Amino acid sequence: MKMMKPITMVAAILFCGGATTPEPPGAPADQFFSRIAALCGRSFEGRLVTADAADAAMAGQRLVMHVADCTADRIRIPFHVGADRSRTWLITRTAAGLRLKHDHRHEDGAPDALTNYGGDTAGPGAAERQEFPVDAESIALFRREGRAASVTNVWAMEANGLLFAYELRRPAGPNVRHFRVEFDLGRAVPTPPPAWGAAGR
């Protein structure tokens, strides 16, 4: 009886076993969204890893993010800086990718004059990182509120299983900026109090 060569035998086994080509992964934006949604309900402590002078006051504060609630199309993440609970990140699905907005509130829950700014992803990005260039609505808001330095903002978020990062950059020039805070996903912390104005959002 003629014996099959090892390589031929392996090929035959795979063929007879109905081996199929793996399905292609989802869009990077969808993968990224799913990574964040998997953290829903949990809170994590972070640290400032950049050294811009504008962020000096934040350097000594306790930084906590809380993936507070998630739907199929939106994730809400309050970001607490010490006792200041005014900041919330909103990640929303769009037809082309993802949108990041910043919801800023006063302690009584009223919207700050500088709120609902951000931008949409301009490309596919990666499952681990998405970037959000400033949108036209936010540029108009920044100019109206005397924050013209912010009209070139690009925000980014990263999630790689070990850490979550939030980042702000501006290109080189008189308004150059780099802010980045990283959160350790390996150690959850107790849930902080709700963000200001969280009720009804």
Can you describe what each PLM-predicted range is?
Residues 48, 75-82, 102-103, 166-170:
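Short beta-strand segments that buttress and anchor functional surface loops
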Residues 130-171:
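Helix-rich interaction surfaces within compact, conserved domain-sized segments
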Residues 89-141:
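An exposed acidic His-Trp-rich patch
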Residues 60-62, 84-88, 150-152, 176-178:
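Short, surface-exposed coil-to-beta transition loops
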Residues 25-54, 102:
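Tryptophan-anchored aromatic micro-motifs
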Residues 15-26:
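Bacterial Sec-dependent signal peptides at the C-terminal "C-region" and cleavage site
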Residues 45-72:
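Short, solvent-exposed loop/hinge segments that bridge or flank secondary-structure elements
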Residues 115-120, 161-201:
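Edge beta-strand at a domain terminus
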